[in-house]
Amino acid sequence: MIHPVRRALAVAASRAPRQFLAAASRTTSVRSVRAAAASGSYYSTTSRRLQDAFPSQLENLASSTLPKVVPQVPQTLTEKIVQRYSVGLAPGKKVKSGDYVTLQPHHCMTHDNSWPVAMKFMSIGASKIHDNRQVVMTLDHDVQNKSEANLKKYRQIEEFANTHGVDFYPAGRGIGHQIMVEEGYAWPGTVTVASDSHSNMYGGVGCLGTPMVRTDAASIWATGKTWWQIPPIAKVTFTGLLPPGVTGKDVIVALCGLFNNDDVLNHAIEFTGAEETMRSIPVDDRLTIANMTTEWGALSGLFPIDAVLASWMRAKATVTAMEHPELGDKAKFTHAKIDALLENPLVADPGATYAKQLYLNLSTLSPFVAGPNSVKIATPLKDLEAQNLKLDKAYLVSCTNSRASDIAAAARVFKDAAADNNGVIPKVAPGVKFYIAAASLLEQKQAEDSGDWQVLLDAGAEPLPSGCGPCIGLGTGLLEPGEIGISASNRNFKGRMGSTDAKAYLASPEVVAASALKGKIAGPGWYQKPEGVEKVIIGEGNGVVEQDKAMSIEDALDKIIAEAESLIANAEAGLTPESTSSSSSSSSSSEEESLTEILPGFPEAISGEIIFCDADNINTDGIYPGKYTYQDNITPAKMAEVCMENYDASFGSIARAGDILVTGFNFGCGSSREQAATAILAKQIPLVVSGSFGNIFSRNSINNALMGVEVPKLVQRLREEFGDKVATRRTGWKLTWDVRRSKVVVEEASGKKWEQKVGELPPNVQEIIARGGLEKWVKSQIEA
């Protein structure tokens, strides 16, 4: 039974005007520590996700696409940070999920792709970087490549950076994402982007990090700005405490594997929990979790600006003051800067609306391993240990898990084993190669000073330069056909770390080290299952009243406020429950009558034979192999030849020019490489149809003039018709995309025809495609 006082509070709050609700939320101070058992959650809804598009005029983006007057509404942490870095907003405008904004990010990082970005920058007619303090360049991906071509590219990048006064970090200094964090570029409460898919990592320090593509980076260099549509926002609440022997890597591997139905695909994630819960997750673990939200399908993974982060920053400020007193207030981390940050830290408003809410009880987690060859397959370590999987290679590398704390965990495995080996550090198992590379030189120095680095060398580990290396399939130590590898990195797609005939697993640093020591996938034995824990407790919102009873008073009030805000918003929009429920039926007829404006010269319809790649989650490595990504002299003919090579080696001989490529769901997930789109164009395939697309791929497609449309019904119908799963199939079906009428017409091999309404391709997107992509569009604007 609900307590009468609580019921009265709920009723009063639900009937109160917005001003009262806001005041009540500000005065609520109860911070209940959630119980170890996971509580339920609920779903609230946001407006329909709009199609990504670059507005016709960057400068007029906000004023041309957003209403001039909007109601004041509670904001999520993501929305608050975006608010600070959006320009050109209407007076009083509060940004919300679904809005298009012009972003002026705090920083923009590029890595080995800096030279291709520079070439785009120069080709559009730009001669000066808009704000050189905004741009950071790092060399980290192909640092083992000593060929003259690669060294020349590296020289060109350094010379370009020096010419424009840009902060530059040479090869061997560290992985770009780690540098952005340790050098303070990824500052809490800011928006910081990079032309790399793992920009999400910055969320570990309360910085909204999200990936951009090369063309976006060139736009930022030239104008200081680019476009972004605020994604749906998911709230992930942690309960319980992270047990000994369980790490941030286990948390994110479990999330990827347990919520593996695209639950957070193309969402911005906000992680939260009771103060005690969040204290159990140190910053290094937060960085790991945020880093791999990319593999979970999200566009960002944001942790709160809290006491844990403040302590981490204070420690860095103290060390800097002691080691470099000459820097004074010019140091990246100072106590004065931290004081200013913490004076009024950004937090989500009570009653902020989330598209989705998920819960995970940390107390019920055990060590997990992802794979083989997929982050969506998460298996408890104890189950894999029982299989005695013989190991060939182990990797303690990448920006995900090769910081000093990770190296210390790996070293501890060998130190513990030395106790049973007369105090001598044992060697890795015969036949196993163990590769190590620190996330940065600073992290390596810290590991060297502690002696942990030397422990791993004594154990027989082979050191590599600080850089991406094996994680992206470059340099020494790649997996050979038939081999099994385990890595502390973030991505184990087939062929990512070497041969497509190898098997790659992902795990925490201590599991990687223990596996190298024992010659099979194994753990160090640090984890002891708590009494009463039988399974991982997770939850999704379903609106069950019994679950609501378990909420804290503050959470309950938040929910009431959210519901009240929804009612108010609908009332202000003139909507009633009856009108919203009938909107779908009434809108269908109006959609039939609406016609999209077609720009002169743009085709009104696109037709072709369907070639079907029957798989979900075809990633960018499958579309365009990583080993070609940084070979900037590859011809279009070669790109066409290797298109889809890692997915299906026979694709090149089956596909024909003019085909329409149809794939499963979440096509183009993975890295931010633009070649995933341009290789398809090189194959002379003008249109990709999918059940759904990865967001970065969608952005790359528009920016590079590749058209795409989502038609889930077509994927389902093809799977019904062709029951036997074939990687690539010529169907004999024909598809016509009627751009003007926003529909597709499908003619099956039997002669049966049917049609389906699809999203509109607005004139501003047509303009980009007609120009040949964003780069040429920006050039046309400069020349105009």
UniProtKB/Swiss-Prot annotation:
Keywords: Amino-acid biosynthesis, Iron, Iron-sulfur, Lyase, Lysine biosynthesis, Metal-binding, Mitochondrion, Transit peptide. Residues 578-589 have a biased composition (Low complexity). It catalyses: (2R,3S)-homoisocitrate = cis-homoaconitate + H2O. GO terms for biological process: lysine biosynthetic process via aminoadipic acid. Binds 1 [4Fe-4S] cluster per subunit. The keyword Metal-binding applies. CDD domains: Homoaconitase_Swivel (cd01674). It is found in: Mitochondrion. GO terms for molecular function: 4 iron, 4 sulfur cluster binding; homoaconitate hydratase activity; metal ion binding. GO terms for cellular component: mitochondrial matrix. Gene3D superfamilies: Aconitase, domain 3, Aconitase, domain 4. Pathway: Amino-acid biosynthesis; L-lysine biosynthesis via AAA pathway; L-alpha-aminoadipate from 2-oxoglutarate: step 3/5. [4Fe-4S] cluster binds at residues 399, 468, 471. InterPro entries: Acnase/IPM_dHydase_lsu_aba_1/3 (IPR015931), Acoase/IPM_deHydtase_lsu_aba (IPR001030), Aconitase/3IPM_dehydase_swvl (IPR015928), Aconitase_4Fe-4S_BS (IPR018136), Aconitase_4Fe-4S_dom (IPR036008), AconitaseA/IPMdHydase_ssu_swvl (IPR000573), Homoaconitase_mito (IPR004418), Homoaconitase_swivel (IPR039386). The keyword Methyltransferase does not apply. Its EC number is 4.2.1.36. Residues 572-596 are annotated as: Disordered. PROSITE patterns: ACONITASE_1, ACONITASE_2. Residues 1-32 form a transit peptide. Its cofactor is [4Fe-4S] cluster. Catalyzes the reversible hydration of cis-homoaconitate to (2R,3S)-homoisocitrate, a step in the alpha-aminoadipate pathway for lysine biosynthesis. Belongs to the aconitase/IPM isomerase family. This is Homoaconitase, mitochondrial. It comes from Neurospora crassa (strain ATCC 24698 / 74-OR23-1A / CBS 708.71 / DSM 1257 / FGSC 987).
